[in-house]
Protein backbone atom coordinates (compact mmCIF):
# COMPACT_ATOMS: atom_id res chain seq x y z
CA UNK A 1 0.00 0.00 0.00
CA UNK A 2 2.86 2.35 0.83
CA UNK A 3 4.50 1.72 -2.57
CA UNK A 4 1.14 2.28 -4.27
CA UNK A 5 0.74 5.70 -2.65
CA UNK A 6 4.27 7.06 -2.55
CA UNK A 7 6.05 5.76 -5.68
CA UNK A 8 7.09 8.79 -7.74
CA UNK A 9 5.33 9.17 -11.07
CA UNK A 10 6.23 11.75 -13.72
CA UNK A 11 3.63 13.72 -15.69
CA UNK A 12 5.18 12.58 -18.98
CA UNK A 13 4.43 8.88 -18.36
CA UNK A 14 1.63 6.76 -19.88
CA UNK A 15 -1.17 6.46 -17.32
CA UNK A 16 -2.92 3.14 -16.75
CA UNK A 17 -5.90 2.93 -14.36
CA UNK A 18 -3.53 1.84 -11.59
CA UNK A 19 -1.02 4.62 -12.23
CA UNK A 20 -3.78 7.25 -12.55
CA UNK A 21 -5.29 6.22 -9.22
CA UNK A 22 -1.85 6.11 -7.60
CA UNK A 23 -1.00 9.64 -8.80
CA UNK A 24 -4.35 11.18 -7.82
CA UNK A 25 -4.85 9.35 -4.50
CA UNK A 26 -2.69 11.76 -2.42
CA UNK A 27 -4.79 14.68 -3.72
CA UNK A 28 -8.02 12.83 -2.90
CA UNK A 29 -6.83 12.01 0.63
CA UNK A 30 -5.58 15.59 1.02
CA UNK A 31 -8.95 17.11 0.09
CA UNK A 32 -10.89 14.64 2.24
CA UNK A 33 -8.62 15.38 5.22
CA UNK A 34 -9.09 19.12 4.69
CA UNK A 35 -12.87 18.64 4.72
CA UNK A 36 -12.80 16.40 7.80
CA UNK A 37 -10.78 19.00 9.72
CA UNK A 38 -13.41 21.61 8.84
CA UNK A 39 -16.13 19.25 10.04
CA UNK A 40 -14.29 18.63 13.34
CA UNK A 41 -14.14 22.41 13.82
CA UNK A 42 -17.91 22.64 13.40
CA UNK A 43 -18.57 19.64 15.69
CA UNK A 44 -16.72 21.42 18.51
CA UNK A 45 -18.73 24.62 17.98
CA UNK A 46 -22.15 22.93 17.57
CA UNK A 47 -21.75 20.59 20.56
CA UNK A 48 -19.74 22.73 23.00
CA UNK A 49 -20.78 26.31 22.18
CA UNK A 50 -24.36 25.82 20.93
CA UNK A 51 -26.57 25.78 17.83
CA UNK A 52 -26.94 29.60 17.76
CA UNK A 53 -23.15 30.05 17.63
CA UNK A 54 -22.97 27.29 14.99
CA UNK A 55 -25.60 29.11 12.91
CA UNK A 56 -23.70 32.42 13.29
CA UNK A 57 -20.44 30.84 12.05
CA UNK A 58 -22.29 29.31 9.08
CA UNK A 59 -23.83 32.71 8.30
CA UNK A 60 -20.50 34.57 8.03
CA UNK A 61 -18.55 31.69 6.43
CA UNK A 62 -19.66 32.43 2.81
CA UNK A 63 -18.15 35.94 3.04
CA UNK A 64 -14.84 34.52 4.28
CA UNK A 65 -14.89 31.94 1.48
CA UNK A 66 -15.40 34.67 -1.14
CA UNK A 67 -12.23 36.43 0.00
CA UNK A 68 -10.26 33.18 -0.04
CA UNK A 69 -11.50 32.18 -3.51
CA UNK A 70 -8.59 33.98 -5.23
CA UNK A 71 -6.30 31.29 -3.84
CA UNK A 72 -8.29 28.61 -5.65
CA UNK A 73 -8.34 30.69 -8.85
CA UNK A 74 -4.58 31.27 -9.05
CA UNK A 75 -3.83 27.75 -7.81
CA UNK A 76 -5.90 25.81 -10.34
CA UNK A 77 -5.58 28.29 -13.22
CA UNK A 78 -1.89 28.89 -12.60
CA UNK A 79 -0.99 25.23 -12.18
CA UNK A 80 -2.75 24.39 -15.47
CA UNK A 81 -0.72 27.08 -17.26
CA UNK A 82 2.54 26.01 -15.58
CA UNK A 83 1.89 22.32 -16.43
CA UNK A 84 1.20 23.29 -20.06
CA UNK A 85 4.42 25.36 -20.15
CA UNK A 86 6.43 22.47 -18.68
CA UNK A 87 4.89 20.10 -21.25
CA UNK A 88 5.98 22.50 -24.00
CA UNK A 89 9.57 22.29 -22.65
CA UNK A 90 9.94 25.82 -21.16
CA UNK A 91 11.02 25.13 -17.56
CA UNK A 92 12.55 28.60 -16.95
CA UNK A 93 9.39 30.38 -18.11
CA UNK A 94 7.24 28.00 -16.01
CA UNK A 95 9.20 28.93 -12.87
CA UNK A 96 8.91 32.66 -13.58
CA UNK A 97 5.13 32.35 -13.99
CA UNK A 98 4.89 30.25 -10.81
CA UNK A 99 6.86 32.84 -8.78
CA UNK A 100 4.86 35.77 -10.17
CA UNK A 101 1.56 34.12 -9.21
CA UNK A 102 2.64 33.46 -5.62
CA UNK A 103 3.91 37.02 -5.11
CA UNK A 104 0.70 38.46 -6.63
CA UNK A 105 -1.37 36.25 -4.32
CA UNK A 106 0.40 37.52 -1.19
CA UNK A 107 -0.21 41.14 -2.25
CA UNK A 108 -3.90 40.55 -2.95
CA UNK A 109 -4.27 38.65 0.32
CA UNK A 110 -3.01 41.66 2.29
CA UNK A 111 -5.52 43.97 0.57
CA UNK A 112 -8.42 41.55 1.15
CA UNK A 113 -7.51 41.09 4.82
CA UNK A 114 -7.66 44.84 5.52
CA UNK A 115 -10.85 45.33 3.48
CA UNK A 116 -12.55 42.27 4.98
CA UNK A 117 -11.96 43.39 8.57
CA UNK A 118 -13.14 46.93 7.77
CA UNK A 119 -16.48 45.79 6.28
CA UNK A 120 -17.17 42.78 8.51
CA UNK A 121 -19.98 44.31 10.60
CA UNK A 122 -22.09 45.71 7.73
CA UNK A 123 -21.58 42.50 5.73
CA UNK A 124 -22.77 40.41 8.71
CA UNK A 125 -25.92 42.55 8.95
CA UNK A 126 -26.46 42.24 5.19
CA UNK A 127 -26.25 38.44 5.46
CA UNK A 128 -29.10 38.47 7.97
CA UNK A 129 -27.35 38.34 11.35
CA UNK A 130 -29.68 39.38 14.17
CA UNK A 131 -28.51 41.08 17.38
CA UNK A 132 -27.70 37.70 18.97
CA UNK A 133 -25.66 36.41 16.03
CA UNK A 134 -23.92 39.68 15.04
CA UNK A 135 -21.20 39.78 17.75
CA UNK A 136 -20.42 36.09 17.14
CA UNK A 137 -20.10 36.64 13.37
CA UNK A 138 -17.81 39.64 13.86
CA UNK A 139 -15.54 38.15 16.53
CA UNK A 140 -15.14 34.88 14.57
CA UNK A 141 -14.62 36.67 11.24
CA UNK A 142 -11.98 39.13 12.49
CA UNK A 143 -9.76 36.33 13.81
CA UNK A 144 -10.17 34.12 10.72
CA UNK A 145 -9.35 37.03 8.38
CA UNK A 146 -5.95 37.43 10.06
CA UNK A 147 -5.06 34.04 8.56
CA UNK A 148 -6.36 34.86 5.07
CA UNK A 149 -2.93 35.01 3.36
CA UNK A 150 -1.73 31.60 4.63
CA UNK A 151 -5.19 30.18 3.82
CA UNK A 152 -4.89 31.42 0.23
CA UNK A 153 -1.32 30.12 -0.01
CA UNK A 154 -2.38 26.72 1.30
CA UNK A 155 -5.10 26.45 -1.35
CA UNK A 156 -2.73 27.58 -4.11
CA UNK A 157 0.13 25.28 -3.15
CA UNK A 158 -2.19 22.25 -3.07
CA UNK A 159 -2.45 22.53 -6.87
CA UNK A 160 1.17 23.50 -7.50
CA UNK A 161 2.55 20.60 -5.43
CA UNK A 162 0.74 18.22 -7.81
CA UNK A 163 2.19 20.05 -10.83
CA UNK A 164 5.64 19.82 -9.19
CA UNK A 165 5.11 16.01 -9.02
CA UNK A 166 5.01 16.20 -5.21
CA UNK A 167 1.37 15.33 -4.34
CA UNK A 168 2.63 13.35 -1.32
CA UNK A 169 4.12 16.51 0.22
CA UNK A 170 0.74 18.18 -0.22
CA UNK A 171 -0.79 15.30 1.72
CA UNK A 172 1.78 15.61 4.54
CA UNK A 173 1.14 19.37 4.77
CA UNK A 174 -2.62 18.85 4.95
CA UNK A 175 -2.27 16.23 7.68
CA UNK A 176 0.06 18.51 9.68
CA UNK A 177 -2.34 21.46 9.37
CA UNK A 178 -5.36 19.32 10.20
CA UNK A 179 -3.84 17.70 13.28
CA UNK A 180 -2.85 21.18 14.47
CA UNK A 181 -6.46 22.33 14.03
CA UNK A 182 -7.98 19.37 15.90
CA UNK A 183 -5.52 19.53 18.81
CA UNK A 184 -5.95 23.29 19.21
CA UNK A 185 -9.76 23.00 18.87
CA UNK A 186 -9.76 20.53 21.76
CA UNK A 187 -7.50 22.82 23.80
CA UNK A 188 -9.11 26.20 23.04
CA UNK A 189 -12.80 25.19 22.83
CA UNK A 190 -13.14 22.10 25.05
CA UNK A 191 -10.50 22.73 27.74
CA UNK A 192 -10.07 26.52 27.91
CA UNK A 193 -13.69 27.19 26.80
CA UNK A 194 -12.82 30.14 24.57
CA UNK A 195 -15.94 29.58 22.41
CA UNK A 196 -16.02 30.56 18.74
CA UNK A 197 -12.94 32.76 19.22
CA UNK A 198 -11.01 29.64 20.26
CA UNK A 199 -12.26 27.76 17.18
CA UNK A 200 -11.23 30.69 14.95
CA UNK A 201 -7.77 30.87 16.54
CA UNK A 202 -7.27 27.12 16.05
CA UNK A 203 -8.27 27.54 12.40
CA UNK A 204 -5.80 30.31 11.56
CA UNK A 205 -2.88 28.67 13.39
CA UNK A 206 -3.45 25.50 11.36
CA UNK A 207 -3.56 27.61 8.18
CA UNK A 208 -0.19 29.13 9.04
CA UNK A 209 1.18 25.58 9.19
CA UNK A 210 -0.47 24.70 5.86
CA UNK A 211 0.80 27.82 4.09
CA UNK A 212 4.30 28.05 5.58
CA UNK A 213 5.60 24.51 4.93
CA UNK A 214 5.17 24.56 1.11
CA UNK A 215 6.33 28.20 0.99
CA UNK A 216 9.62 27.23 2.65
CA UNK A 217 9.89 24.14 0.40
CA UNK A 218 9.61 26.16 -2.81
CA UNK A 219 11.89 28.97 -1.54
CA UNK A 220 14.73 26.50 -0.87
CA UNK A 221 16.57 24.39 -3.47
CA UNK A 222 14.45 21.27 -4.09
CA UNK A 223 14.30 18.27 -6.42
CA UNK A 224 11.04 19.29 -8.13
CA UNK A 225 10.71 21.27 -11.35
CA UNK A 226 9.36 24.34 -9.54
CA UNK A 227 11.08 26.86 -7.28
CA UNK A 228 10.23 30.37 -6.06
CA UNK A 229 12.79 32.93 -7.16
CA UNK A 230 13.27 36.00 -9.30
CA UNK A 231 10.60 36.64 -11.84
CA UNK A 232 9.71 38.88 -14.73
CA UNK A 233 6.30 40.46 -15.11
CA UNK A 234 4.33 38.18 -17.42
CA UNK A 235 1.13 40.21 -17.68
CA UNK A 236 -0.43 37.95 -20.28
CA UNK A 237 0.39 34.83 -18.24
CA UNK A 238 -1.14 36.41 -15.11
CA UNK A 239 -4.35 37.18 -16.99
CA UNK A 240 -4.33 33.70 -18.55
CA UNK A 241 -3.97 32.08 -15.11
CA UNK A 242 -6.89 34.17 -13.82
CA UNK A 243 -8.97 33.24 -16.89
CA UNK A 244 -8.07 29.54 -16.53
CA UNK A 245 -8.96 29.56 -12.84
CA UNK A 246 -12.03 31.73 -13.24
CA UNK A 247 -14.23 28.61 -13.07
CA UNK A 248 -12.82 27.70 -9.64
CA UNK A 249 -13.11 31.34 -8.56
CA UNK A 250 -16.68 31.43 -9.86
CA UNK A 251 -17.45 28.15 -8.09
CA UNK A 252 -16.35 29.55 -4.74
CA UNK A 253 -18.06 32.92 -5.25
CA UNK A 254 -21.24 31.26 -6.50
CA UNK A 255 -21.31 28.72 -3.68
CA UNK A 256 -21.02 31.57 -1.20
CA UNK A 257 -23.81 33.56 -2.86
CA UNK A 258 -26.00 30.44 -3.08
CA UNK A 259 -25.29 29.60 0.57
CA UNK A 260 -26.50 33.08 1.50
CA UNK A 261 -29.69 32.46 -0.51
CA UNK A 262 -30.19 29.04 1.12
CA UNK A 263 -29.70 30.60 4.56
CA UNK A 264 -32.22 33.33 3.73
CA UNK A 265 -34.83 30.79 2.57
CA UNK A 266 -34.23 28.60 5.63
CA UNK A 267 -34.42 31.54 8.07
CA UNK A 268 -37.77 32.37 6.44
CA UNK A 269 -39.12 28.80 6.53
CA UNK A 270 -37.54 27.37 9.71
CA UNK A 271 -35.57 30.05 11.55
CA UNK A 272 -32.05 29.50 12.92
CA UNK A 273 -32.77 25.75 13.21
CA UNK A 274 -32.98 25.55 9.42
CA UNK A 275 -29.60 27.29 9.06
CA UNK A 276 -28.11 24.80 11.52
CA UNK A 277 -29.51 21.84 9.53
CA UNK A 278 -28.11 23.29 6.31
CA UNK A 279 -24.75 23.73 8.04
CA UNK A 280 -24.72 20.02 8.95
CA UNK A 281 -25.48 19.01 5.35
CA UNK A 282 -22.83 21.36 3.97
CA UNK A 283 -20.08 20.05 6.23
CA UNK A 284 -20.84 16.42 5.37
CA UNK A 285 -21.21 17.42 1.70
CA UNK A 286 -17.67 18.89 1.81
CA UNK A 287 -16.26 15.44 2.64
CA UNK A 288 -18.09 13.67 -0.19
CA UNK A 289 -17.42 16.41 -2.75
CA UNK A 290 -13.75 16.48 -1.68
CA UNK A 291 -13.25 13.05 -3.26
CA UNK A 292 -14.29 14.38 -6.67
CA UNK A 293 -12.36 17.64 -6.17
CA UNK A 294 -9.24 15.73 -5.14
CA UNK A 295 -9.40 13.45 -8.18
CA UNK A 296 -9.96 16.41 -10.51
CA UNK A 297 -7.11 18.38 -8.90
CA UNK A 298 -4.76 15.40 -9.07
CA UNK A 299 -5.50 14.54 -12.70
CA UNK A 300 -5.59 18.10 -14.12
CA UNK A 301 -1.78 18.60 -14.36
CA UNK A 302 -1.51 15.29 -16.27
CA UNK A 303 -4.11 16.53 -18.77
CA UNK A 304 -2.39 19.93 -19.04
CA UNK A 305 1.05 18.37 -19.56
CA UNK A 306 -0.03 15.97 -22.33
CA UNK A 307 -2.08 18.69 -24.01
CA UNK A 308 1.00 20.94 -23.98
CA UNK A 309 3.11 18.07 -25.36
CA UNK A 310 0.56 17.41 -28.13
CA UNK A 311 -0.10 13.82 -27.03
CA UNK A 312 -3.73 13.40 -28.10
CA UNK A 313 -3.76 9.59 -27.68
CA UNK A 314 -2.91 9.90 -23.99
CA UNK A 315 -5.50 12.68 -23.64
CA UNK A 316 -8.24 10.40 -25.00
CA UNK A 317 -7.22 7.62 -22.62
CA UNK A 318 -7.18 9.97 -19.62
CA UNK A 319 -10.71 11.21 -20.30
CA UNK A 320 -12.13 7.71 -20.83
CA UNK A 321 -10.48 6.29 -17.71
CA UNK A 322 -11.50 9.30 -15.60
CA UNK A 323 -15.17 9.03 -16.58
CA UNK A 324 -15.16 5.32 -15.64
CA UNK A 325 -13.53 6.06 -12.27
CA UNK A 326 -16.03 8.86 -11.53
CA UNK A 327 -18.98 6.57 -12.38
CA UNK A 328 -17.86 4.04 -9.76
CA UNK A 329 -17.22 6.83 -7.21
CA UNK A 330 -20.66 8.36 -7.81
CA UNK A 331 -22.60 5.14 -7.21
CA UNK A 332 -20.58 4.18 -4.12
CA UNK A 333 -20.82 7.64 -2.52
CA UNK A 334 -24.56 8.00 -3.13
CA UNK A 335 -25.23 4.60 -1.57
CA UNK A 336 -22.97 5.45 1.39
CA UNK A 337 -24.68 8.82 1.91
CA UNK A 338 -28.15 7.26 1.99
CA UNK A 339 -27.05 4.53 4.41
CA UNK A 340 -25.18 6.93 6.71
CA UNK A 341 -27.76 9.75 6.82
CA UNK A 342 -28.82 9.01 10.41
CA UNK A 343 -25.40 8.36 12.05
CA UNK A 344 -23.86 11.40 10.34
CA UNK A 345 -26.76 13.61 11.47
CA UNK A 346 -26.38 12.35 15.05
CA UNK A 347 -22.78 13.60 15.17
CA UNK A 348 -23.99 17.20 14.89
CA UNK A 349 -27.50 17.38 16.34
CA UNK A 350 -27.56 14.68 19.03
CA UNK A 351 -28.39 17.41 21.61
CA UNK A 352 -31.12 18.92 19.41
CA UNK A 353 -33.81 16.16 19.17
CA UNK A 354 -36.24 18.37 17.25
CA UNK A 355 -33.67 18.93 14.48
CA UNK A 356 -32.67 15.26 14.05
CA UNK A 357 -35.59 14.00 11.86
CA UNK A 358 -35.43 17.16 9.72
CA UNK A 359 -31.67 16.72 9.23
CA UNK A 360 -32.00 13.03 8.27
CA UNK A 361 -34.73 13.74 5.70
CA UNK A 362 -32.85 16.74 4.28
CA UNK A 363 -29.62 14.75 3.92
CA UNK A 364 -31.42 11.80 2.26
CA UNK A 365 -32.85 14.11 -0.43
CA UNK A 366 -29.62 16.07 -0.89
CA UNK A 367 -27.58 12.84 -1.27
CA UNK A 368 -29.08 12.11 -4.69
CA UNK A 369 -26.95 14.96 -6.09
CA UNK A 370 -23.81 12.82 -5.60
CA UNK A 371 -24.86 10.78 -8.66
CA UNK A 372 -24.22 13.81 -10.92
CA UNK A 373 -21.83 16.19 -9.18
CA UNK A 374 -18.61 14.25 -9.89
CA UNK A 375 -19.02 14.48 -13.66
CA UNK A 376 -19.67 18.22 -13.47
CA UNK A 377 -16.65 18.93 -11.25
CA UNK A 378 -14.40 16.85 -13.51
CA UNK A 379 -15.70 18.43 -16.74
CA UNK A 380 -14.96 21.93 -15.45
CA UNK A 381 -11.51 20.87 -14.22
CA UNK A 382 -10.78 19.09 -17.53
CA UNK A 383 -11.36 22.28 -19.54
CA UNK A 384 -9.27 24.29 -17.05
CA UNK A 385 -6.43 21.82 -17.67
CA UNK A 386 -6.87 22.36 -21.43
CA UNK A 387 -6.47 26.11 -20.75
CA UNK A 388 -10.05 26.71 -21.92
CA UNK A 389 -11.12 29.01 -19.10
CA UNK A 390 -14.32 30.08 -20.85
CA UNK A 391 -15.94 26.63 -21.10
CA UNK A 392 -14.72 25.72 -17.62
CA UNK A 393 -16.21 28.92 -16.19
CA UNK A 394 -19.44 28.41 -18.15
CA UNK A 395 -19.99 24.97 -16.58
CA UNK A 396 -19.10 26.22 -13.10
CA UNK A 397 -21.15 29.41 -13.37
CA UNK A 398 -24.24 27.58 -14.60
CA UNK A 399 -23.86 24.72 -12.11
CA UNK A 400 -23.10 26.66 -8.95
CA UNK A 401 -25.04 29.88 -9.55
CA UNK A 402 -27.60 30.00 -12.37
CA UNK A 403 -29.17 26.55 -11.90
CA UNK A 404 -28.94 26.63 -8.10
CA UNK A 405 -30.44 30.11 -7.73
CA UNK A 406 -33.31 29.17 -10.05
CA UNK A 407 -33.94 25.89 -8.23
CA UNK A 408 -33.75 27.24 -4.67
CA UNK A 409 -36.05 30.12 -5.65
CA UNK A 410 -38.71 28.05 -7.45
CA UNK A 411 -38.79 24.62 -5.74
CA UNK A 412 -39.61 25.84 -2.18
CA UNK A 413 -42.74 27.46 -3.64
CA UNK A 414 -43.83 24.01 -4.88
CA UNK A 415 -42.54 21.72 -2.10
CA UNK A 416 -41.90 24.04 0.86
CA UNK A 417 -38.82 22.98 2.90
CA UNK A 418 -38.26 19.81 0.81
CA UNK A 419 -37.84 22.09 -2.20
CA UNK A 420 -34.77 23.65 -0.57
CA UNK A 421 -33.10 20.24 -0.17
CA UNK A 422 -34.09 19.10 -3.69
CA UNK A 423 -32.75 22.28 -5.33
CA UNK A 424 -29.17 21.01 -5.56
CA UNK A 425 -30.35 17.72 -7.16
CA UNK A 426 -32.19 19.66 -9.87
CA UNK A 427 -29.23 22.01 -10.42
CA UNK A 428 -26.68 19.17 -10.76
CA UNK A 429 -28.96 17.34 -13.23
CA UNK A 430 -29.15 20.40 -15.47
CA UNK A 431 -25.38 20.93 -15.13
CA UNK A 432 -24.74 17.32 -16.20
CA UNK A 433 -26.58 17.96 -19.48
CA UNK A 434 -24.47 21.08 -20.06
CA UNK A 435 -21.20 19.27 -19.21
CA UNK A 436 -22.03 16.46 -21.65
CA UNK A 437 -22.84 18.98 -24.40
CA UNK A 438 -19.52 20.81 -23.86
CA UNK A 439 -17.45 17.59 -23.85
CA UNK A 440 -19.10 16.41 -27.08
CA UNK A 441 -18.95 19.83 -28.73
CA UNK A 442 -15.23 20.43 -28.07
CA UNK A 443 -13.95 16.89 -28.78
CA UNK A 444 -12.54 17.66 -32.25
CA UNK A 445 -10.92 20.96 -31.24
CA UNK A 446 -8.86 19.34 -28.46
CA UNK A 447 -8.61 15.85 -29.99
CA UNK A 448 -9.67 13.86 -26.92
CA UNK A 449 -12.35 11.81 -28.70
Label the predicted regions.
Residues 29, 33, 37, 67-71, ...:
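Residue-level hotspots within pore-lining transmembrane alpha-helices
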Amino acid sequence: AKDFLFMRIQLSEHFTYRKLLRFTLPSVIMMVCTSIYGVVDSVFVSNLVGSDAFAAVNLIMPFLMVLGAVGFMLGTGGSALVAYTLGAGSEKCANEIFSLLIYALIGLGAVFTIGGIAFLTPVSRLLGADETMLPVCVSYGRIVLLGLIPYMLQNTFQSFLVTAERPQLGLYVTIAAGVTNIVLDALFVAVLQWGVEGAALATILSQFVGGAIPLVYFLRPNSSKLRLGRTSFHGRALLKACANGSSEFMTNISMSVVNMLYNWQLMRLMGSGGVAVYGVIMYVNFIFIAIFLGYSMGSAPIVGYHYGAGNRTELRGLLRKSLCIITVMSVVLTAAALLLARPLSLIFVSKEPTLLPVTIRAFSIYSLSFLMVGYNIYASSFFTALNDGFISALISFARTLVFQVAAVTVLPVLWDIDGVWAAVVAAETLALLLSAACLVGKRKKYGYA
